[in-house]
Regions:
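Tandem CBS (Bateman) regulatory domains
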Residues: 1-12, 51-80, 86-96, 117-143
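Generic leucine side-chain signal with a strong bias for well-ordered alpha-helical environments
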Residues: 7, 26-27, 46, 91, ...
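The conserved cystathionine-beta-synthase
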Residues: 16-34, 40-41, 81-99, 106
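Short, charge-rich amphipathic segments
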Residues: 21-32, 63-74, 109
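A glycine-centered beta-loop-beta connector
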Residues: 30-33, 38-54, 95, 103-118
Length: 143
């Protein structure tokens, strides 16, 4: 299975923010869309990603004053990305190796989607269910 298959199932919409968005505005957007990370974009495209984990760590370090600061202060600027043609298994390894749960998808230099570990698990569960149904059909039809 490829990343393109995951995006086909979940859609390619990506919630983005600009680097000067405040952490408070970031949190409001994450709550509104019920998501765990937002991609930070500038005029030239992807510049970073900010996750719930980034916010929690920085709040612990800097306190509530962080809420009025721009997300550029806390974003991860070296972003792990993948491509639509990449295998889901490869992405799973990448997520584990880099300890990230959200990976932007880049196609032809443009942001084409985002895949979370939850999306990967859901897709894999659907794949396993289809395999199970095929095996049950094979068994009941006498192989």
């Amino acid at each position: 299975m490829r990343i393109a298959d995951v995006l086909r199932n979940k859609g390619s919409a990506v919630a983005t923010i600009s680097p000067d968005t405040t952490v408070t505005e970031l949190l409001a957007g994450m709550a509104q869309y019920n998501i765990g990370a937002m991609v930070v974009t500038g005029p030239d495209g992807l510049v970073g990603i900010v996750s719930e984990r980034d916010v929690v760590r920085r709040l612990n370090e800097r306190g509530a004053d962080l809420l009025g600061q721009p997300v550029s202060e806390i974003m991860t600027s070296v972003v792990v990305t993948c491509a639509p043609g990449d295998a889901v298994d490869t992405l799973t390894g990448l997520m584990t190796e880099n300890r990230v749960r959200h990976v932007p998808v880049i196609a032809n230099g443009q942001l084409a989607g985002i895949v979370s570990i939850g999306d990967v698990v859901k897709t894999r569960m659907e794949e396993l269910k289809a395999e199970q149904e095929q095996l049950q059909t094979y068994i009941t039809q006498g192989g």
